C-alpha cells in the first residue's frame, strides 16, 4: 500500500529499527534519508510536508515514548503529522478480551509483548501545546478486525 502511494511523492525519508527493512527500502526507493534507528532519535532536518507513522505506536515501550516521537514528528513536518492505528486506551480491555478469545493461552504466548495504548486526550493536549488542529478518524476497513480498537490521528499546522 505505502509503495503504491509513493508514486505520488517527490521526496521520501524514514526510519526503522530493522537494518534489514532499511536495506530493502533503499533498494526500492530513491531516498537518501533512510536511517536504522529508534523513532525518538529522528532528526528534525530535513523537513517534509507530511510525516507519517503507519501502525507502529502500538509497539513503542510506553505512551510517554510515543508522545516524544509525536514531538519529533511535529518538528519535522511542514504541514501535517499522520499517525495510523493508535491503540485506544478506552478499548484496551475489550481488545485484550477479544484476543484472548481468538488465541488459546493468549496471555502466556504473548507475555512480555504488550501493546501500548494511548488516550485521545494525550494527542489533544499535544495539539493544544503545539497550536495544532487535531482530528481523529476511525479506520474504515471491514476486513480488519482491529479497526474497532484503534484510531488514526491527524495533526495539522
What are these regions (language model features)?
Residues 60-72:
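A short, conserved alpha-helix within the catalytic core of class I
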Residues 49:
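Functional-site microenvironments in short loops/helix caps that host divalent-cation chemistry
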Residues 52:
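A conserved beta-strand element that flanks and buttresses the S-adenosyl-L-methionine
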Residues 4-7, 70-74:
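A structural alpha-helix within SAM-dependent methyltransferase catalytic domains
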Residues 55-59:
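Short catalytic micro-motifs in class I SAM-dependent methyltransferases
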Residues 1-46, 81-157:
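Class I (Rossmann-like) S-adenosyl-L-methionine-dependent methyltransferase catalytic domain
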Residues 77-79:
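A short helix->loop->beta-strand "cap" motif at the edges of active sites that frequently abuts
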Amino acid at each position: 500500500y505505502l509503495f503504491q502511494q509513493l508514486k505520488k511523492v517527490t521526496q521520501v525519508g524514514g526510519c526503522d529499527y530493522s537494518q534489514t527493512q532499511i536495506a530493502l527500502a533503499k533498494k526500492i526507493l530513491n531516498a537518501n534519508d533512510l536511517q536504522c534507528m529508534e523513532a525518538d532519535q529522528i532528526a528534525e532536518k530535513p523537513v517534509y510536508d507530511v510525516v507519517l507513522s503507519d501502525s507502529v505506536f502500538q509497539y513503542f515501550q510506553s505512551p510517554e515514548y510515543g508522545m516524544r516521537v509525536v514531538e519529533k514528528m511535529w518538528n519535522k513536518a511542514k504541514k501535517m503529522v499522520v499517525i495510523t492505528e493508535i491503540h485506544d486506551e478506552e478499548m484496551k480491555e475489550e481488545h485484550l478480551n477479544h484476543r484472548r478469545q481468538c488465541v488459546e493461552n493468549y496471555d502466556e504466548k504473548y507475555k512480555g509483548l504488550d501493546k501500548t495504548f494511548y488516550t485521545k486526550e494525550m494527542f489533544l493536549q499535544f495539539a493544544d501545546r503545539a497550536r495544532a488542529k487535531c482530528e481523529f478518524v476511525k479506520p474504515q476497513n471491514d476486513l480488519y478486525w482491529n479497526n474497532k480498537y484503534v484510531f488514526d490521528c491527524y495533526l495539522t499546522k
